[in-house]
From Swiss-Prot:
One of its GO terms (cellular component) is proton-transporting ATP synthase complex. It comes from Liriodendron tulipifera (Tuliptree). In plastids the F-type ATPase is also known as CF(1)CF(0). Belongs to the ATPase B chain family. The gene is atpF. Its main location: plastid. F-type ATPases have 2 components, F(1) - the catalytic core - and F(0) - the membrane proton channel. F(1) has five subunits: alpha(3), beta(3), gamma(1), delta(1), epsilon(1). F(0) has four main subunits: a(1), b(1), b'(1) and c(10-14). The alpha and beta chains form an alternating ring which encloses part of the gamma chain. F(1) is attached to F(0) by a central stalk formed by the gamma and epsilon chains, while a peripheral stalk is formed by the delta, b and b' chains. This is ATP synthase subunit b, chloroplastic. PANTHER family: ATP SYNTHASE SUBUNIT B, CHLOROPLASTIC (PTHR34264:SF3). The keyword NADP does not apply. It holds the Pfam family ATP-synt_B. F(1)F(0) ATP synthase produces ATP from ADP in the presence of a proton or sodium gradient. F-type ATPases consist of two structural domains, F(1) containing the extramembraneous catalytic core and F(0) containing the membrane proton channel, linked together by a central stalk and a peripheral stalk. During catalysis, ATP synthesis in the catalytic domain of F(1) is coupled via a rotary mechanism of the central stalk subunits to proton translocation. Keywords: ATP synthesis, CF(0), Chloroplast, Hydrogen ion transport, Ion transport, Membrane, Plastid, Thylakoid, Transmembrane, Transmembrane helix, Transport.
Amino acid sequence: MKNVTDSFVSLGYWPSAGSFGFNTDILATNLINLSVVLGVLIFFGKGVLSDLLDNRKQRILSTIRNSEELREGAIEQLEKARARLRKVEMEADEFRVNGYSEIEREKQNLINATYENLERLENYKNETIHFEEQRAINQVRQRVFQQALQGALGTLNSCSNSELHLRTISANIGVLGAMKEITD
């Protein structure tokens, strides 16, 4: 490495009269030296620079392609999600409408069942009242019949004598005899 550096340093000490050499003093360089240095840099650096630029260009294009593919995929997923959302919204509306109609139907069924139950209860109440009335009437009749029977028995016992018994028996025998003649 030292030899390479020494060779460049020795180039700087060559006499500039009549020979070609590099002037390493940047402030003392002239336009020709600068153009030679630039020419050498362009000639040798052109390939490296174009390779770097091509690599950079390929990476940028690859990144753009990947971004476009990702964008298209995202757009496709967005459209699918929108389609699913529309479908779910339609199903929700359908459920909502069906739910409201189902609620109305159940409400009407409940009202009808309630009216039927009330009607049955009213009929049962009326039947119970009628039954209780009949039972009360029958009890009153039995009581009246018992009192009348007791009164009649009391009257018969108080007024009974053998003559009355004989007349009652003969009247009953006469009634039975008349009935026998009618049936024959």
